[in-house]
Amino acid sequence: MKQRTLSIIKPDALKKKVVGKIIDRFESNGLEVIAMKRLHLSVKDAENFYAIHRERPFFKDLIEFMVSGPVVVMVLEGKDAVAKNRDLMGATDPKLAQKGTIRADFAESIDANAVHGSDSLENARNEIAFFFAARDL
């Protein structure tokens, strides 16, 4: 089934200048970039986007990291896009990610792990709406 999912290329990946390589992974695996923008998240936007984690011990560090530099936010579309993107990203902790996944190849730590991807179709819809108006899609 054709789906849409949200992907964020995080500040660590932008600093390493691997955005093009990450996008190529998506495109060469059947995911089309249908909307994309580069931006610098405000603390308020980062806190609102990651509100589900507000009570978790890593929340403060996550927000500090996500506002530490620009990010690239994309809507990816393709067959089973949510699951495919999750597979391409690999485990949250790059030390546990399978070789050949984005996080295994480009991430340094569980915090600086290169990419974010929606974890369900429902969250994908909400996350896409957070960053993109319907007219942008």
From Swiss-Prot:
One of its GO terms (cellular component) is cytoplasm. ATP binds at residues 10, 58, 86, 92, 103, 113. SUPFAM superfamilies: Nucleoside diphosphate kinase, NDK (SSF54919). It catalyses: a 2'-deoxyribonucleoside 5'-diphosphate + ATP = a 2'-deoxyribonucleoside 5'-triphosphate + ADP; a ribonucleoside 5'-diphosphate + ATP = a ribonucleoside 5'-triphosphate + ADP. It is found in: Cytoplasm. GO terms for molecular function: ATP binding; metal ion binding; nucleoside diphosphate kinase activity. InterPro entries: NDK-like_dom, NDK-like_dom_sf, Nucleoside_diP_kinase, Nucleoside_diP_kinase_AS. Pfam families: NDK. The active site is at 116 (pros-phosphohistidine intermediate). One of its GO terms (biological process) is GTP biosynthetic process. Homotetramer. This is Nucleoside diphosphate kinase. The gene is ndk.
